[in-house]
Amino acid sequence: MFVAMNRFRIAVGHEEAFENIWKGRESSLAEMPGFRTFHLLRGDTNAEEGYTLFASHTVWASKDDFTAWTQSENFRQAHKNAGDNRGIYLGPPKFEGFTAVVGA
């Protein structure tokens, strides 16, 4: 199992707009071999630094399945508007990938 996460720092006051971007986007993840699940997670707000933390969280059967997604036309289509709404982001997302070593 492989877990892929992108962490986003979203400017305070723009959380709902960010969530709506994700709610309104077309996704073809379910069509991809090895895809298991997706969640958009909302974390705490850091008032001092002016952001709320979010993470996109996908689970894949394997890292190879995730890599195939990132190289697919479906991925390109899903991310074609990624540069829009720049004012709500405090920097680019930070990717983190994990391979399961223990699980139930």
Go through each PLM region and give its residues.
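Residue-level preference for beta-strand/loop junctions
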Residues: F2, G50-T52
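Active-site-flanking beta-strand signature of metal-NTP-handling nucleotidyl enzymes
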Residues: V3-F8
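Short hydrophobic/aromatic beta-strand micro-patches
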Residues: R9, L41, H57-V59
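Short, surface-exposed ligand-recognition loops at beta-strand->loop->(often short) alpha-helix junctions
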Residues: I10-E19
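Feature marks short, surface-exposed loop/turn motifs that line or immediately flank catalytic pockets
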Residues: V12, D44, K63-D64
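An amphipathic, aromatic/His-enriched active-site/gating alpha helix that lines ligand/cofactor pockets
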Residues: G24-R36, Y51, V59-E96
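Flexible, low-complexity linkers/stalks enriched in Thr/Pro that connect modular domains
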Residues: L41, E96-G103
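Acidic pyrophosphate-coordinating catalytic loop
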Residues: D44-G50, G103
